[in-house]
Amino acid sequence: MENTKPNVLILCTGNSCRSHMAEGILRHVAGDLFDVNSAGSNPAGYVHPLAIQVMKEIGIDISRHTSKHMKEFLGGNITTVITVCGNADQACPMFPGQVNRYHWGFEDPAHAKGTDEEMLNTFRQVRDRMKLVFEAYAAGSREFATTHGKHPNNAA
């Protein structure tokens, strides 16, 4: 049985909202199964305050996350890359190498318009959709590990 946890990298363009929310959720529900990080192809240099706020509402603290470039992870031991870019007009980053790849598109809440409450609700909606997707991913991975005695991403 493989003792090393698979390394999951969650990518989007700016690494300011979606990828951090996804990283926080996946760490929260499956930190025992995966080492989780996030990065972007064109990092914004900050984590959006509304992303921090809506994650705190569900008991997940991402306030110490930092915006990172995907280059920091090249040549590393990444086993799975999950892209979370949502719009067809976005240049979703491609991570080179032999990795498991998933794309789960989510609207970018950083582009939300309206009142403060409307913008906050957009962040909450994206967070709640991400929570469902990443909880399901974690549950499937946990079931596989229990049944097969190894992580699915280490099942080569």
Task: Locate each region found by the language model.
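A short, aliphatic-rich alpha-helical micro-motif
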Residues: 74-75
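Conserved active-site segments centered on acidic
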Residues: 1-71
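Phosphate-binding/catalytic loops
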Residues: 89-156
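Short glycine-rich anion-binding loops that position phosphate/pyrophosphate groups of nucleotides
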Residues: 16, 86-89
